[in-house]
Amino acid sequence: MTDYTTYLGFRHLEKLYTASSLSFDCETTGLKPQVGGLRLLQFASAARKIVVVVDLFAASEEELAQLDLFFTNGDRFWLAHNAVFDLGWLQAYGWHPRGEVRCTMLASKILTNGMPNLKHGLAPVAKRYLGIDVSKEEQRSDWSGELTEAQIRYAAKDVEIL
């Protein structure tokens, strides 16, 4: 897998503004919007080998408005793992990606329909189809505090794999 360049901050969304296809992921402080917060949004372009990570806890109102324009600009192809989870969070914040959304978790379930004892989280799917080992150790870390380098690397890698 080719290494992507990772950028942190809203100003870097412009690097992806015209991309026709993007992977996206969310890092949250809870499993549901009613009991947690949306901490990070990560976007990746395979064509451009770029990942952009934005920290919503540090966002201004202007930057949040920028996200609405970003999600509705053009007619993109969006790819996520467990898209139902991610889209639920986006919709809770009033963001509705324009275009087609595809889910690698659902694709894995369809491809392995009827095969017992298979898991469909990102780590087992990446191992099964890409031969890549993915550490999910940071997934359970505290996303409500100051972000660590390890958390940012984890968030970027999750969306890069897609």
Could you tell me what each predicted segment is?
Residues 29:
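Conserved Rossmann-like nucleotide-cofactor binding loop
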Residues 1-26, 34, 60-63:
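N-terminal accessory regions of nucleic-acid-interacting proteins
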Residues 32, 36, 42-161:
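Active-site-proximal helix-loop-helix substrate-binding element of RNase H-like nuclease domains
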Residues 18-20, 39-42:
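N-terminal G-site helix/loop of the GST-like fold
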